[in-house]
């Protein structure tokens, strides 16, 4: 099982890199308090519960989305909602998963 998780992580990492290369926008769906504790530079912040109200704004970005949160649960919910609304999106999981790639350029 440990090997499976390692393989899955590598796939997620590669997918994140691919999306960043396509100019994806990082969408952080955590609370304002969590966001203020640290976030990926250049990320957009829309709290999960507000996403349905901001769907037209998100669509207007016209770019793929990498949804992130603290653990991957809320970003998973956001990913499902955005995908159901025709947006090219992946669940980046915890924001640190994406941040490590953004910081390295």
PLM segments and residue spans:
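Short, surface-exposed ligand- or partner-binding patches at beta-edge/loop junctions that are enriched
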Residues: 68
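Phosphate-rich cofactor/ligand-interacting catalytic cores and adjacent structured alpha/beta frameworks
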Residues: 28
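Rhodanese-like catalytic fold shared by cysteine-dependent sulfurtransferases
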Residues: 2-24, 32-64, 73-105
């Amino acid at each position: 099982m440990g090997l499976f998780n390692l393989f899955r992580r590598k796939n997620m990492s590669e997918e994140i890199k691919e999306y960043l290369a396509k100019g994806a926008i990082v969408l952080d769906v955590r609370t304002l308090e969590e966001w203020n504790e640290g976030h990926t530079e250049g990320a957009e912040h829309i709290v999960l519960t507000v996403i349905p109200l901001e769907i037209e704004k998100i669509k207007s970005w016209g770019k793929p989305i990498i949804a992130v949160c603290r653990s991957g649960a809320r970003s998973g919910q956001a990913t499902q909602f955005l995908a159901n609304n025709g947006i090219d999106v992946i669940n980046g999981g915890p924001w640190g998963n994406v941040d490590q790639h953004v910081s390295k350029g």
